[in-house]
Amino acid sequence: MASTKIDDKVSIPGPVTGTGNSRFLIVSHENGGIWDLVRFGVWGNKESGDKFLHYSAGGGLLEEHLVRSDDSGGGDDRGGEVPDHRWVIFVSIIVRKLIAIFGKPMEWTGYLVEFFLNLFSLNGNFLGLLYNILHGKVVMPHRGSETFISAIGHLDGRINLYKSETLTKEIGEPDFWQKIGIGHRDLMDLCMMASKLAYENEKVVRNVVNLHWKMHFVDFYNCWNDFEKEMSTQVFLLCDKPKDANLILVSFRGTEPFDADDWITDFDYSWYEIPKLGKVHMGFLEALGLGNRTNASTFHEQLFVNNLKFANLENVHATIPPSESSKSSTSFSDSDAHTGSDLSSDSERPTDTRKKKFRLEIPERTAYYVVRSKLKRLLKEHKNAKFVVTGHSLGGALAILFPAVLVLHEEVDVMERLLGIYTYGQPRVGNRQLGRFMEAHLEHPVPKYFRVVYCNDLVPRLPYDNKTFLFKHFGICQYYNSLYIEQNINEEPNPNYFGMRFLVPLYLNAGWELIRSFTMGYMYGSEYEECWESVMLRALGLFLPGISAHSPVDYVNSIRLGKARSTQMSSF
């Protein structure tokens, strides 16, 4: 078989920041067969490994890519046994192959599950549906309508904020920004609820933000992932009020339970090395629209070349009066796939010719550039506002990488108004160098990045990490055990999820969570009573504990019921 090295050296005219000679490693699960995988995983056969592993021509030996967590120096661990890392990648490829095999069945199952969940809900559950069938009054669900709720929304039907009136009042106080930190429960609750709401369609998001939270819905975006060739990245923005806002929130959608591509991304070990930042998870960069692994040079082009192009367009757009620029774009239609045009959230097309030109010249409908442009306009319009970025699961990964790229692009004025980054059940996004880079910008003068992890949630333990492997968490970890006891630590317990000494506690804990689901309403009130969908997921947790622990139900409960750890307690 021909060499699998991919030449990512590109020559791009004009002044650019960074280099086109970056290093990368792509782990492809679809190329080789099972026998190739066995030969690579068990015996370390290089020819078989080359079918799965593609790496940059200038990056040195493949073993370097597998063993060394950071080649930039600075005190990182070096060495390690190549077979250990080969085994990790071997398991990753198997899992991704299995997910890919069940990709279509997962998608069909998702459609059926969400259809019947909404059918029962709209007709008053099972008995109500039978009654409506007999009387010819069945209400049919319509995907994309204001009454169609996602599977995640059915797991946790809570839509109201913890203390919405208190939060709205506090945001307007002059010293509110000094109160922000790990312990600000109301803001953490808003971020978690927004992360959960991001799984819904635009109409549901708009209704909840405007009618229930009494805030101002700004925009909802469906953004292009060039590798997946679909609009698979969703994000929405809100302000605490329409005029003179004090708070702007950006919420990225997370891993959808029936989306095979999302789960494959979570289990992916591919990375791309960005100058200054370090090695970053390639799948998450693709979700932000910042490249496509089928042509590695596109990462350099999106990160550096298009940044200069787009910055010039933003400067042109800055000349438009705020009253006009406040009419912004939301989701894109398929017909606009390669024009970069979009529609305003109130279905009105802008009449200003300069604004039309700006829209048509947007390089791509990518999440990073679209959100950055809108955020800069909002910050210009609301002079006193600060912004937070949030997300659950994969959305949490995008929430931390979005400001990371802002720092890379030296968006100093924007980053000065960052209030905080709150992620929930977030997977690992890069290596130690990325962690050091971001901590230097987010830890001083006060911490601005808070990573919340519930108990045995599987996703924060992905991709796999050990003393020498690539992916590392960074920032403050706010960890909650299954009793909702809070602890601030550097790394969650059982950081890699697997291991015999953790196996029995994992299943015991899953059994306890199933029992607890029947008592929550009695212990804490009707607001915490778990629906039958959530109980069924708990039952599934008896077989896959880490999956059930990833539910937003426990993250909302952790924030609202969480108690500071006062004595030495088990992580059970």
From Swiss-Prot:
Residues 346-356 have a biased composition (Basic and acidic residues). Residues 320-356 are annotated as: Disordered. Residues 323-334 have a biased composition (Low complexity). The active site is at residues 393, 457, 550. It catalyses: 1,2-di-(9Z-octadecenoyl)-glycerol + (9Z)-octadecenoate + H(+) = 1,2,3-tri-(9Z-octadecenoyl)-glycerol + H2O; 1-(9Z-octadecenoyl)-glycerol + H2O = glycerol + (9Z)-octadecenoate + H(+). A motif (GXSXG) lies at residues 391-395. This is Triacylglycerol lipase OBL1. It comes from Nicotiana tabacum. The lineage of its organism: Eukaryota, Viridiplantae, Streptophyta, Embryophyta, Tracheophyta. The gene is OBL1.
